UniProtKB/Swiss-Prot annotation:
SMART domains xref list: ZnF_C2HC
Biological processes, Gene Ontology terms: viral budding via host ESCRT complex; viral translational frameshifting
Organism: Simian immunodeficiency virus agm.vervet (isolate AGM3)
Keywords of this entry: Capsid protein, Host cytoplasm, Host nucleus, Host-virus interaction, Lipoprotein, Metal-binding, Myristate, Phosphoprotein, Repeat, RNA-binding, Viral budding, Viral budding via the host ESCRT complexes, Viral nucleoprotein, Viral release from host cell, Virion, Zinc, Zinc-finger
Organism lineage: Viruses, Riboviria, Pararnavirae, Artverviricota, Revtraviricetes
Motif (Nuclear export signal): 16-22
Descriptive protein name: Gag polyprotein
Record site feature (Cleavage), residues: 443-444
Amino acid sequence: MGAATSALNRRQLDKFEHIRLRPTGKKKYQIKHLIWAGKEMERFGLHERLLESEEGCKKIIEVLYPLEPTGSEGLKSLFNLVCVLFCVHKDKEVKDTEEAVAIVRQCCHLVEKERNAERNTTETSSGQKKNDKGVTVPPGGSQNFPAQQQGNAWIHVPLSPRTLNAWVKAVEEKKFGAEIVPMFQALSEGCTPYDINQMLNVLGDHQGALQIVKEIINEEAAQWDIAHPPPAGPLPAGQLRDPRGSDIAGTTSTVQEQLEWIYTANPRVDVGAIYRRWIILGLQKCVKMYNPVSVLDIRQGPKEAFKDYVDRFYKAIRAEQASGEVKQWMTESLLIQNANPDCKVILKGLGMHPTLEEMLTACQGVGGPSYKAKVMAEMMQNMQSQNMMQQGGQRGRPRPPVKCYNCGKFGHMQRQCPEPRKMRCLKCGKPGHLAKDCRGQVNFLGYGRWMGAKPRNFPAATLGVEPTAPPPPSPYDPAKKLLQQYADKGKQLREQRKKPPAVNPDWTEGYSLNSLFGEDQ
């Protein structure tokens, strides 16, 4: 694009930079998007100058539109950008990318153009092109039906390359996994034996699996011939013969005969549906061969998440060649039985017949690192408690159970107690104070540890004005009573010391020394 912005002039560039990338977003288109689009055009073999005009953008859209539904994110982004440029060249007012894509679909009629192109490219068996006006779709069929009616004749429409490409990619990626059977059923809906053989012939690899399918086809064809013998005698002129097993397999019948058996024969024989059932039986055998693991062998690993185990289990159930009742019984009995011990304990606690949603919710997180750490912590705690009990049993009598000092319950210690911490005295057992401040016990002098100074032998006299109000009632304190008794006793002793000793008047004369020595004394 030269200067990378030559695709738009100044006015168009201003309009381009006002278009939002998403309806609810704030980001808008910039010049760098045009530069990126010019580089991406080379990947699809398109010249970058096609972006400079409306017709060029229309040609780009016609090339990218068939690839857009199944394309990569880069292809879808390029398609959206070209739609925006188309609207800018056409002077259409758009606000975001979705509006531009909707306008392009309306203006270009891409859906109708694609259908008309597919119809015009198909030719009749005689080599002439079909007339679209006279082509109708079989009743109950889709527009991609492999047979269409033109007048009174049915015309075969071969499978599109896109359908064959999708089938080949599915086989290469899944390697005949359990998904191949429903994929074949979806792609072969309404096909003739010729179309089904074409789907099998495009598979270059996996010839061993195709040989198994051929053996199943031969067995079913032989059983068909036994169950439907040909009529005796020659057929009337103009009457269509009955299909044999090889006719159903498409080896001895033409495409026109297959269409007549399906749509115009009386009675009709849907050889396409019959041959499709045979192929499905063969594919189921291949799935079982390529997936030898039985559902009985699916077990959950010790560190495997339950969700991953459920995915592996149902994938094996899907590959099992059994009826629906058998699969239901296997699911109900084996899903819980083959789980690991951790999940099995949880699943058995859910009761009888829990739903899959309940099981996935209950086992969520089981097997992860956090769950393993929790289990290891519980195991370590149990081992420590057992060791402590064994050590205590060797010394003598068993140790009593642990009791919480905070709440008084058994089974845990104070540091593990969930209740709020309470302050309790170790001496008296009452809450509200500690042992160092306990007033319920005194020493031999009658004084407790709460007094900081040396105790006196008498109550200290209070100086100053005494309050007129009566003192507040205080609870009974035995220490105060004992202290008062000691104070009263001390007061009595001091008073007795101050009094002179008692003298008996009878002793003054009889016991005096004056009577013995006279005045010498």
